[in-house]
Amino acid sequence: YFMKKIAVIGTGGTGYTVAAELSLRGFEVWLCDATPVEAEAAYIEQNVEVKLTGAMEGTATVRAVTNDPKAALADTQLVICCTISNLDEQTARFIAPHLYPGSAVLISAGNLGALIYHRVFQELGVKDPIVGDTCGNLFSCRRLGDRVAFAGNGYSPKKVAAFPVRDTGKLVKAFEGIYELIPASSLLETTFNAPNLLSHISLTIVNAGAIENAKEPYYIFKQGICRSTLNLADGMWAEKKKVMDALGLPCAPSPSGNHRKYADPTVHQFDHFKNLIGPDSMSSRYITEDIPILGCFFLSMAKALGVETPLYAA
């Protein structure tokens, strides 16, 4: 039976995976394409079957797939935004006119998106919104086709922070029974401890030649890990640790520990994760999203703190 209506914004891999997984658990999910269109181009497709594969399996019936934000956001105060961080302002403006007072907006994978959403919501007069970021994406996933999503992992509890941070408890409570969320101290903690700041950047740049010359689909977590990437990850992590220490924030462990497990043929815990396809070029979001939005902000913060980060700067 349907328990609560949840609006999921964004129809990429994360949007489809989140919508399918929630639907399998009995929630009424409206999945909304975040590309603005003219009113006459709006559509609503009801009871859409979405196949979920990989670490989570099942065929879900998503209540509706649409590009009409008014319909998607009707009669709900629970919103999960799953668009690329480069589109945060566009997405915030897309949903703002249709939000109910007191709506809770969870941004996956965060990346300081709550700052932008908060500013837009203030500008457009949204009443009492609760908006916050997850620390890393809700799922590592891909959209494989029109109605097929691949999950590299199941759900594990996520740290979250709202902006302003005094709303973090309200955000956790709003999604109680939907996701287990753990309060973080600030958006800086969730942003800098997200794995993409380090893993995507280090793995992709070192493997640029292999990615661009690949004749077959490339799997970076299966093919891209070697001694050099492990050393680079540890070096970048040491720089990150200095910045986190200067901020007085906890620092997540170096990803090299998990990367070593990915490279170990006797370890099968991460087999689905290693089957996440891509990237296929140097214009993938691993570069175009994670470097300008995460990497550059991290460098600015390090500079403001007087912490040297030569590897990140390079």
Task: Please report, for each region that a protein language model flagged, where it lies by residue.
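Active-site-lining helix/loop region of Rossmann-like oxidoreductase modules
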Residues: 158-254
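NAD(P)-dependent Rossmann-like dehydrogenase/reductase catalytic/cofactor-binding core
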Residues: 212, 230-314
